[in-house]
């Protein structure tokens, strides 16, 4: 039995110091390790500078396009019904969850790259995601294919 009576209010997040953007602030918070926010900010802004030097494009625009391309369109979940686990199927999606997954995937696959420093890893992943390639985009496509393959179970309403 639930003890809470009302809705949970989402936390208020301030925009980042440079662009005053809440999405960048969320990205920096997810990038942060051991509470070292200043280090995470430095890595993020250095990555944007690397993008500006390599491409000559607006790094803020590159980041936004990369994040938009990395956001999944569908989510797949397994469901247990009557002792049987049904395969992963497509489910409804909330905008905040799409953003969170896109951020999480960009950071995870940036850390897995072979470049020397984190700023270079992050910049490379942003540039690849903007072009529609890269590991984060591959993850998004894999999930979409899984949802398409298991569309037979999408008629269930839980």
Curated annotation (Swiss-Prot):
PROSITE patterns: RIBOSOMAL_S7 (PS00052). GO terms for molecular function: rRNA binding; structural constituent of ribosome; tRNA binding. SUPFAM superfamilies: Ribosomal protein S7. One of its GO terms (biological process) is translation. It holds the Pfam family Ribosomal_S7. The keyword Cytoplasm does not apply. InterPro entries: Ribosomal_uS7, Ribosomal_uS7_bac/org-type, Ribosomal_uS7_CS, Ribosomal_uS7_dom, Ribosomal_uS7_dom_sf. Keywords: Ribonucleoprotein, Ribosomal protein, RNA-binding, rRNA-binding, tRNA-binding. One of its GO terms (cellular component) is small ribosomal subunit. Gene3D superfamilies: Ribosomal protein S7 domain. Part of the 30S ribosomal subunit. Contacts proteins S9 and S11. HAMAP family: Ribosomal_uS7_B (MF_00480_B). Belongs to the universal ribosomal protein uS7 family. One of the primary rRNA binding proteins, it binds directly to 16S rRNA where it nucleates assembly of the head domain of the 30S subunit. Is located at the subunit interface close to the decoding center, probably blocks exit of the E-site tRNA. This is Small ribosomal subunit protein uS7. The gene is rpsG.
